[in-house]
C-alpha cells in the first residue's frame, strides 16, 4: 500500500512540489495519459524548425495541420509509453496514481486511443502537409516508445543521451512542413535539442533518483551518483551553449538579433549549471535548473521566430552596415 503522506526529499521538498501531483491537478484519465504537459515544448521546437526554413511563414492551414498532427502524434506516444510502463508506474509513489495503474482507465481503451491518435496524426499530416512530415512524426513516435522506453531506459544510464532523438525530431518535422525537405538548419536545431536533453532530464533525475532506484531503472544519478551526474550536466550544458550560437548562421536572416538576444539565456543557463556543480546534492538548485532548462528551450524557439520578423532583418542590415563603416574608417584599429 502506498502512503498518502508526501515523501520528503533532501532540503525538505516533496515530490509533489517538483512534479505536480495528479491529486492536486486532476485531469480526465484519457487526457492524463496523453501527457499534455510535454506537448507544448514539442510544438515549440516544431515552430523553431519552421522558422529556420526558407518556406517561413507557412500558410495558416498547413501550419495548423502541422501542429495538430504533431500534437496527436505526441499524444499517441505518451499513451503508448503509459501502457508500456503501467506496472512500473504502479510501483513508484510519484506515478502510482496515474490513470492506468490506478485502474481509472483500462489498457484496452488506452490502446484504442493511441491507435486512433496515430491514425489521425498520419491522415492530417499526409493530407494537410506532406508525406515527409508525416513520416518523421511517426519516426519520433516509434523512437520514443521503442528505442527509449522499451530498449534504452531499462538497460543503460545513457538512455536519455541516445533516446533523446525522439524529442529532437519535431524540428525536422517543422522544417519538412515549411520547405518539403530538411536542410542543415533543421539538423542544427535537431542537434541542439539532442545536446540540451541530457542536462534537462538529469536535473530531474537527480530529484527522483530514489524512485528510479526503487524500481531498478538505471538512470545516471542512480548508477554514478550526484557528483558524476552534475559533471555530465555541466558538459552537456556547455555543449548546448556553444552549439546554440551557430543559430546566427543557421537562420536565413535575423541571425545577428538572435545572437544578441541569446546572450542572457546562455548566461543564465551556465550560471545555474555552475551553481548546481558547487552543490550537487542541493534539491533547490537541481529543481531550478530543470525548470530553467524548459524555459530556455522555449526561449530559443521564440528567438528563432522573432528573428524571422521583418524588423529583425532590418536590424541585421543596419548593424552590418554600421560595422562595415567602422571597419572602413579604421575605428577597429
UniProtKB/Swiss-Prot annotation:
The signal peptide stretch is: none
- The enzyme's first-digit EC class, named in words, is transferase
Q: Where does the source fall among the domains of life?
A: Bacteria
GO BP annotations of the record are:
heme O biosynthetic process
Which Gene3D superfamilies does the record match to this protein?
A: UbiA prenyltransferase
Recite the UniProt keywords alphabetically: Cell inner membrane, Cell membrane, Heme biosynthesis, Membrane, Transferase, Transmembrane, Transmembrane helix
The record's GO CC annotations read: plasma membrane
TM region(s), chain numbering: 63-83, 109-129, 132-152, 160-180, 188-208, 214-234, 245-265, 292-312
Q: Which CDD domains match?
A: PT_UbiA_Cox10 (cd13957)
Q: Which GO terms label this protein's molecular function in UniProt? A: protoheme IX farnesyltransferase activity
Membrane topology annotation: Multi-pass membrane protein
Q: Where in the cell is it found?
A: Cell inner membrane
**Main role?**
Converts heme B (protoheme IX) to heme O by substitution of the vinyl group on carbon 2 of heme B porphyrin ring with a hydroxyethyl farnesyl side group.
Q: Sorted alphabetically, which PANTHER family does this protein's record hold? A: 4-HYDROXYBENZOATE SOLANESYLTRANSFERASE, PROTOHEME IX FARNESYLTRANSFERASE, MITOCHONDRIAL
Q: Which HAMAP family match?
A: CyoE_CtaB (MF_00154)
Q: What is this protein called?
A: Protoheme IX farnesyltransferase
Identify the species of origin.
Prochlorococcus marinus (strain MIT 9313)
| Gene expressing this chain | ctaB
